[in-house]
Regions:
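Acidic, glycine/proline-rich low-complexity segments that act as flexible tails and inter-domain linkers
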Residues: 4-16, 27-43, 49-50, 64-153, ...
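N-terminal targeting signals for Sec/Tat export/insertion, comprising classic cleavable signal peptides
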Residues: 10-32, 233-245
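Short, structured motif recognition centered on aromatic/hydrophobic residues
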Residues: 17-25, 51-55, 155-165, 194-198, ...
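Short, solvent-exposed alpha-helical surface patches in well-structured domains
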Residues: 19, 53, 158, 193, ...
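Non-heme di-metal
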Residues: 173-174
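Short S/T/G/P-rich N-terminal loop/turn motif that feeds into the first structured element of a domain
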Residues: 221-276, 281-293, 298, 309-332
Length: 332
């Protein structure tokens, strides 16, 4: 088993960055992004078995459904790459069996290595209250799973931290694993980079959970130059249905594909349906400028020119930006 520290370094290497992204996308169930992350990881040199081990380990932190969905996605990715003639490296063989007399003791000692602290039997508090969960943690997670040396302890903690950082409401466990990660050689600089990757793949809010724990400045959720705009549009009646179809497609693509588009919410007046109102919210001015150059917006713009009778753009200022993150949260 490979539990040794690695030499401290300032940055995550490309393979480590891929492990972060794969773990994050798995944890939140974003299979579309996961497919991209898996391809990128293989291209960066992660072996098939390294990725299998990471996805298998993640069931302990984000559940069997997320883990199984990710593994099925990985199988699809490998099949597609094979059909294109891409030969990926299997890597070190995965050892499935773990034949030891006392798995609890094996897991307890592994946990002592990771935490650098004595681990009593049963674990105080939780282990006494729910002995079976204590047994599962020691005998399965820290014995059966961690016994495989396909991933180092440091890589395993990078996987775990990335997953927990992507899930809301698990700050206590994230704190514990960040401490363990540091024991395996993960540095604050690498955790800062990990947080930046989580911000890209999940949100600023989740990335800030890591930054807060390691004492780094939090990134503001709402940018000072956030743009809020109301578009007042009157449509030529004969084009109304065609316009609504194009607008619906453009709004959906913008929200799904552009991280800087917080909302594009089209509406029309009930008594006068040719009067369209669109609430547009952009993270910042750069996001708005980027939006204007996207293919879906350009298609919308050129396709609807003849349909628009009048257009009035009204830039707004929010009275309370701190409540912006609560918009639409109740619609689930």
């Amino acid at each position: 088993m490979s539990a040794q520290k690695t030499v401290d370094k300032q940055n995550l290497n490309p393979k480590e960055q891929s492990l972060v992204k794969i773990s994050s996308s798995t944890a939140i169930g974003n299979l579309e992004n996961l497919k991209l992350d898996l391809n990128k990881g293989l291209d960066e040199g992660l072996s098939i078995n390294e990725i299998k081990e990471a996805l298998t380990q993640l069931y302990a932190y984000c559940g069997f459904p997320r883990s199984l969905n990710a593994i099925n996605t990985f199988k699809t990715v490998l099949d597609e790459r094979k059909s294109k003639g891409i030969k990926d490296n299997d890597g070190k063989k995965i050892v499935v069996e773990n034949k030891v007399a006392d798995k609890y003791e094996q897991g307890r000692k592994t946990l002592e290595t990771l935490t650098k602290m004595p681990q009593s039997k049963p674990a105080p508090g939780l282990g006494e209250f729910a002995p079976r969960i204590d047994a599962f943690l020691k005998e399965h997670l820290f014995a059966d799973i961690f016994v495989s040396d396909v991933l180092t302890f440091q890589q395993r903690e990078l996987v775990t931290i990335s997953a927990l950082a992507s899930i809301s409401g698990v700050e206590s466990q994230l704190q514990s694993h960040i401490n363990i990660g540091k024991n395996t050689g993960i540095t604050d600089d690498q955790l800062v980079e990990l947080a930046d990757l989580i911000q890209e793949s999940v949100s600023k809010t989740q990335a800030n959970t890591v930054r807060k724990i390691i004492g780094k400045p939090l990134v503001p959720i709402i940018e000072n130059d956030m743009m809020v705009r109301i578009s007042e549009i009157e449509i030529v009646p004969e084009f109304l249905e065609e316009y609504k179809s194009i607008l619906k497609e453009e709004a959906s693509a913008s929200v799904k594909l552009e991280k800087g588009v917080i909302a594009i919410f089209p509406m029309y007046e009930q008594k006068n349906p040719t009067q369209i109102r669109i609430i547009e919210i952009y993270a910042d001015k750069d996001s708005y400028q980027f939006h204007l150059q996207t293919p879906h917006f350009q298609h919308y713009k050129t396709s609807t020119l003849k349909m628009v009778k009048s257009l009035n753009l009204i830039d707004m200022e929010s009275l309370d930006k701190e409540t912006m993150s609560l918009i639409f949260q109740k619609i689930k």
